[in-house]
Regions:
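Generic detection of intrinsically disordered/low-complexity segments and helix-coil linkers/edges
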Residues: 2-5, 104, 191, 205
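Glycine-rich ThDP/TPP pyrophosphate-binding loop and its adjacent helix/strand module
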Residues: 13-199
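Acidic-glycine-rich active-site phosphate/pyrophosphate-binding loop
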Residues: 1-13
Length: 224
């Protein structure tokens, strides 16, 4: 829409930004708010109309901020079972390793809030899928700590703070492409991935049509 992508988006500054998630952990707090709204609306109108999960992606820096403590504590207290937070657990901050500034056990911290908390290999698709299935069955909010390597595949910047918030550079991009055996052009989606995405789009169109049909009277009501 004509703007550079904001790394720390603020509501009201540019078109297309619906909410402030610029300050680290603000997005997590927003997610808690969304999950509260879902629970209230689900109770008021029933699961046929409102019944969805809220997903959050958070990093090490997000969970260091005080706001994440307050919001996560509230989520545990309220038992927001439809809140699932993916924690990009790469042990790197913009200043260097997270060990420079934090030494707490994040999994145990979230368990103390009353959360379901687990750790997985964030590069393993099966582990991610199984963790989501498990989280959906739990009666508490879930933190999925995904152990990852920042700058994955970069020969000289993998697991280093130099790949945090900064471009790899043309030469390193070339080396990373070679290392990952990635031959697609910039911003080109491989055909097999595009085909999979389109299958989900078709599935969701069917689900949308069923939802509208089941709730036609409610969603056309003057109440809304």
């Amino acid at each position: 829409i004509g703007f550079p992508t904001a790394g720390h988006p603020e509501y009201g500054e540019l078109e297309g930004i619906e909410t402030t998630t610029g300050p680290l952990s603000q997005g997590l707090a927003n997610g808690v708010g969304f999950a509260i709204a879902e629970q209230i609306l689900n109770t008021k109108f029933g699961k046929n109309l409102i019944d969805h999960f809220t997903y959050v992606f958070a990093g090490d820096g997000c969970l260091m901020e005080g706001l994440s403590h307050e919001a996560s504590s509230l989520a545990g207290h309220l038992g927001l079972s439809k809140l699932i937070v993916f924690f990009d657990d790469n042990s790197i901050s913009i200043d260097g390793p997270t060990s420079l500034s934090v030494s707490e056990d994040t999994i145990e911290r979230y368990k103390s809030y009353g959360w379901n908390a687990l750790s997985i290999n964030g590069h393993d698709h099966d582990e991610i899928s199984n963790a989501i299935i498990s989280a959906k069955k739990n009666s508490a909010p879930t933190l999925i700590a995904c152990k990852t390597k920042i700058g994955f595949g970069s020969p000289n910047k993998e697991s280093k703070s130099s790949s945090h918030g900064s471009p790899l550079g043309e030469e390193e991009i070339k080396l990373t492409r070679e290392n990952l055996n990635w031959s697609n052009k910039d911003f080109e989606i491989p055909d097999h991935l595009l085909e999979s995405w389109r299958k989900f789009s078709k599935r969701n169109e069917v689900l949308k049509s069923k939802w509208i049909a089941n709730n036609k009277k409610m969603i056309t009501s003057s109440y809304f």
